[in-house]
Amino acid sequence: MATPLCQPAASHFIDGTFIEDRTGPEILSVNPVDGEIIAKLHGATSCIIEKAIASAKRAQKEWARKEPAERGRVLSRAADIMRARNRELSVLETRDTGKPISETLVADAASGADCLEYFGAIAATLSGDSIQFGEDWVYTRREPLGVCLGIGAWNYPIQIAAWKAAPALACGNAMIFKPSEVTPLSALKLAEILTEAGLPPGVFNIVQGAGDVGAELATHPAIAKVSLTGSVKTGARVASAAMAGIRPVTMELGGKSALIVFDDADVEAAVSGAILGNFYSAGQICSNGTRVFLQRGIREAFLARLLARVAALKIGDPMDEETDIGPLVSAAHRNRVATYVARAEVEGAYQMAPPRKLPPGDAWHEPVVFTNVTDWMTLAREEVFGPVMAVLDFDDEQDVVARANATDFGLAAGIFTRDLVRAHRLAAELEAGTVWINAYNLTPAGMAFGGIKRSGIGRENGRVAIDHYTQLKSVFVSMQT
């Protein structure tokens, strides 16, 4: 039998080397374009999990003792290697996820490299405080947590792995990372790159598997902290398991974000933001602004330009750099999205975008724009995670803020207006962890990212991420003797 196109050396990466255990359940990595099996792996058994834990515990202490600047240099070298191999990594990500190569070349490994570089630079600046109390004084030490667990999602596999690994390793922790079983491949490449950059064996380990593997890891007494990117349902389950052992968690979960367009907005910029916030990665982005609120005075011009640009989006082979929209990650996920579309029509929403001819295969879905959407419709309340935009009308500022906040989610929001006083006023009033003004879905490594309400706990990226991967120790020094 021929070796699958993207077959890794083995399923797991532990203690600086690839490890296989074929007794674990089979995991098939499938190219969603045509259903081709591109890799066959095996989920972790309890034996594999214990090997990863033992390796990480052993390596973490020595890694933490290294000078922070030395840890930073390893991360910086890894960033350089990732950039040098950006095309190779992007091709792998496109085959595993179905996302267009035009996206993966600029937004996946590249973003991961930026994060490694950012935290590589921060590592040498980690410090505590000194406080005087008369002649006595207190100083604080910022210490690593120990062995951290990262659990990834299938939409940005290598980016998420790097976003979790970079701050953890910069602070002197070890990390065990479990990729999504749907897209298991690129995290293994990150582990190889970190090792090549000089990361000691065991500091970053990869174990494969489904939710049962994540649950076993999250409840393991050796795990000091859990960071997960995924659905609200999965996040609640993992957070509950972690908190049973009094472990801190960082959760980046789902969203139903509002993108608000005022009458005075630049139409072209607002349409660009809405397209980016609904159809990039075929809509499979947690922070997408899928509730597009249009003030009535701009509605007609906005929709006319939007529909013209949506009609021009190229759907096709994701390896073609001219392609704008590829398949969804799987046929099963495509069917889930189609169910939401059908339900929206039953509930009275009107589909504006004309039907498109789709390539052969079971994972494709055309971009959809719904108008006549009301706040009570399922489409306006639940996360679809596909190329489906809901357009809602509004009259005034107070009305739209109240409606934008009327959701269990709080990941992100966008505001398009020329009135920056109004924009800053709304940014303060909107219940969201991230607000973009006259832009959307831009996430530089130096910007903290995360949600409130049911969209998550804690933040990824930015200097604040250091707080989530360290613990403070206070040392009181008496000068009375």
UniProtKB/Swiss-Prot annotation:
Its cofactor is K(+). NAD(+) binds at residues 152-154, 178-181, 231-234, 254, 286, 383. It comes from the Bacteria. K(+) 2 binds at residues 246, 453, 456. Its EC number is 1.2.1.8. The modification Cysteine sulfenic acid (-SOH) is found at residue 286. Pfam families: Aldedh (PF00171). InterPro entries: Ald_DH/histidinol_DH, Ald_DH_C, Ald_DH_CS_CYS, Ald_DH_CS_GLU, Ald_DH_N, Aldehyde_DH_dom, BADH. Binds 2 potassium ions per subunit. It catalyses: betaine aldehyde + NAD(+) + H2O = glycine betaine + NADH + 2 H(+). Pathway: Amine and polyamine biosynthesis; betaine biosynthesis via choline pathway; betaine from betaine aldehyde: step 1/1. Belongs to the aldehyde dehydrogenase family. This is Betaine aldehyde dehydrogenase 2. It comes from Rhizobium meliloti (strain 1021). The lineage of its organism: Bacteria, Pseudomonadati, Pseudomonadota, Alphaproteobacteria, Hyphomicrobiales.
